[in-house]
Structure formats: structure tokens, C-alpha cells
């Protein structure tokens, strides 16, 4: 089994490396069902994507086998969404992610591994429509 230090070093070596792009088309029916699922009846969401929709539309996978060796259990440390323009039904969205930072923090329950992700979302016109920055925590 790898040491925690070697796991952190391997993850840090991947900072900035882009994931393979993944694409999907925003469908009006999916927007409606997503709005129903989050309990938001605003008719705006019949044609425009609600704020967290993109994460459900195209989930970027950054393989983190190294982190599995660090410990057990994942925690979601939160996400920050930044929108540059609305995402509408019919838009074709391509997402690419990367590891932005990796660090450890020691607290009362022990040492935790923090992995910061950034994902960019581009529409069919080549314009960046949104960015998401998230934190995954491994115990």
C-alpha cells in the first residue's frame, strides 16, 4: 500500500492536466424534469438551465485511483458556480475538467486530503458559459 505522502505527490503531479472532454445537448424535457426534481416551479426553467443543471448534464470524470489509496470515504466540500451566460434548451455543451489543487489539513479527527476540481463548460459557439470549482475531501 502506498504512503499518504506518495499519494498526495502523485495527485499533485496531475494538477492542471485536462480530462477528456464530454458533451451533451440540453433538452427542454430534461430541464423540466430537473426543475421538478429540485422543487423549483419557476417557468423560466422550461427553456433555461437552472444553476446546478450542468453538473447533472455532463459529469466530468477525473480518475482518482490514487486517492482511493489515501483512505476511506468521500465528502463533498461544496461547489461554486460561475455563469457567463444562460444555458438554453438546444445548446450543445462540452465540459472539460482538471485538478486545480491538492493539499492536506490536519484537524481533531486526523488528516484529510482535499482535492480541488475546476470544470469549464463551453457551448456550441465555442463560448465559455460556466465554470464550476468543487472540493472533494478524502479521510
Spans of model-derived segments:
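HotDog/MaoC-like acyl-thioester-processing domains
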Residues: 1-6, 10, 86-139
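Hot-dog-fold acyl-thioester-processing enzymes
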Residues: 1-78
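Generic structural detector for well-ordered beta-strands
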Residues: 23-25, 80-82, 135-137
Amino acid at each position: 500500500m502506498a504512503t499518504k505522502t506518495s499519494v498526495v505527490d502523485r495527485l499533485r503531479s496531475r494538477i492542471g492536466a485536462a480530462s477528456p472532454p464530454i458533451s451533451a445537448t440540453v433538452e427542454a424535457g430534461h430541464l423540466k424534469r430537473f426543475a421538478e426534481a429540485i422543487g423549483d416551479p419557476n417557468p423560466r426553467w422550461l427553456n433555461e438551465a437552472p444553476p446546478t443543471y450542468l453538473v447533472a448534464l455532463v459529469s466530468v470524470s477525473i480518475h482518482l485511483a490514487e486517492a482511493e489509496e489515501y483512505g476511506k470515504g468521500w465528502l463533498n466540500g461544496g461547489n461554486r458556480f460561475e455563469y457567463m451566460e444562460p444555458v438554453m434548451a438546444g445548446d450543445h455543451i462540452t465540459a472539460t475538467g482538471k485538478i486545480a489543487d491538492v493539499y492536506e489539513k490536519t484537524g481533531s479527527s486526523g488528516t484529510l486530503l482535499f482535492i480541488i476540481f475546476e470544470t469549464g463548460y463551453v457551448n456550441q459557439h465555442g463560448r465559455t458559459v460556466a465554470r464550476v470549482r468543487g472540493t472533494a475531501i478524502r479521510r
